[in-house]
Amino acid sequence: ATVEVRNNPGYXVVA
C-alpha cells in the first residue's frame, strides 16, 4: 500500500 497526499477524492492510503 502507498500513502499519498493529493487533492483527490481518494487520497490517503491507496493499496
From Swiss-Prot:
Highest taxon of the lineage: Eukaryota
Subcellular location: Secreted, Cell wall
Keywords tagged on the record: Cell wall, Secreted
Full protein name: 25 kDa cell wall protein
Main location: secreted
GO cellular component, one term: extracellular region
Phylogenetic placement of the source organism: Eukaryota, Viridiplantae, Streptophyta, Embryophyta, Tracheophyta
